[in-house]
Regions:
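Terminal domain-initiation and capping elements
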Residues: 1-78
């Protein structure tokens, strides 16, 4: 069993682009363009993989995003 996970961001109607972009930049360490692309994908498809890595690295990021009210889920990469 692998500990590699993807952190998925789900689209919602409660948060605007600026708010989500700021969260992705702060907690996922995205640059402006990467955050913007993730937001557009999540908006158009309903979700977007915003980060991947070891579960122990992903859990704190997920917790911070959820504290900010964003909908996320960790999924296995296989």
């Amino acid at each position: 069993m692998t500990s590699e996970k993807q952190l998925i961001l789900y689209n919602d109607a409660d948060h605007n682009y600026d708010y989500v972009r700021a969260c992705l930049i702060k907690y996922c360490k995205h640059d402006f363009l990467q955050a913007e692309q993730c937001i557009v994908i999540a908006h158009n498809r309903g979700n977007c993989a915003i980060k991947q890595g070891d579960i122990m690295d992903m859990i704190p990021i997920q917790e911070e995003l959820e504290k900010k009210g964003l909908l996320t889920k960790l999924i296995s990469m296989n």
